[in-house]
């Protein structure tokens, strides 16, 4: 039986469970449930702290896990990233008091840096050849400067609102660009079962990025239509009762779909329909 770790709380928990459900896997109904058995798919899910998931997977106790890329890297566990899931995006960056003027990574030499990700910070500082005092805190690192514990911080930055609230400004290149990812232990067993789960999730990710367009097109404009909606290789075309028209079906980028529909209508396409895709295999 495949054993899979899922975040039990935080911003990754809800989307991760929803994506697994879309992929056809049973998920928990009560927040207090720590495990869920899915006998149909021969999978057992374990709901764990996101920060611990890479450790469990890396130790070989679990086969796969969903966690943040930043958490997996900071754990130092022997895990590999199998699939980026497209949610929970953030950047991990240095930040310092705005009143101190412009900072660079070099200015951190000899300074105290508070962070919940000491391994990531230590590795990044080494890349720049900078020696600093890295102070590990479990959360709310923004307040550490005000309390005199640190001179700068390194933390996950989303909208930047929290930094602004504490009069901090981010500087330097992102230490890590993170999102939710599927991880596995290097050299672990059950490869076929793991590949199947990853393929299902990949189908959901892909479906979220595309829509299906159906429309009727004048036969003499098919070449132009095919350029607009090439699909994933070639659009599907079917004859209609009126020989001057052809039905066309193609997958297009969800973001680009409205503009493509406008252009199709402009050159004479009719009955243009956009529909969501639940899942797919490519």
Curated annotation (Swiss-Prot):
Keywords: Amino-acid biosynthesis, ATP-binding, Cytoplasm, Glycosyltransferase, Histidine biosynthesis, Magnesium, Metal-binding, Nucleotide-binding, Transferase
GO cellular component terms listed in the entry, alphabetical order: cytoplasm
A Pfam family per the record: HisG_C
Highest taxon in the source lineage: Bacteria
Subcellular location: Cytoplasm
EC number(s) from the headed UniProt entry: 2.4.2.17
Catalysed reaction, written as an equation: 1-(5-phospho-beta-D-ribosyl)-ATP + diphosphate = 5-phospho-alpha-D-ribose 1-diphosphate + ATP
Cofactors: Mg(2+)
Matches recorded under SUPFAM superfamilies: GlnB-like, Periplasmic binding protein-like II
Regulation affecting activity: Feedback inhibited by histidine.
Record bears the keyword NADP: no
Gene Ontology molecular function: ATP binding; ATP phosphoribosyltransferase activity; magnesium ion binding
Pathway field: Amino-acid biosynthesis; L-histidine biosynthesis; L-histidine from 5-phospho-alpha-D-ribose 1-diphosphate: step 1/9
GO biological process: L-histidine biosynthetic process
Similarity section: Belongs to the ATP phosphoribosyltransferase family. Long subfamily.
NCBIfam families associated with the record: hisG (TIGR00070), HisG_C-term (TIGR03455)
Its job: Catalyzes the condensation of ATP and 5-phosphoribose 1-diphosphate to form N'-(5'-phosphoribosyl)-ATP (PR-ATP). Has a crucial role in the pathway because the rate of histidine biosynthesis seems to be controlled primarily by regulation of HisG enzymatic activity.
Stated name of the protein: ATP phosphoribosyltransferase
Organism: Saccharopolyspora erythraea (strain ATCC 11635 / DSM 40517 / JCM 4748 / NBRC 13426 / NCIMB 8594 / NRRL 2338)
Gene name as annotated: hisG
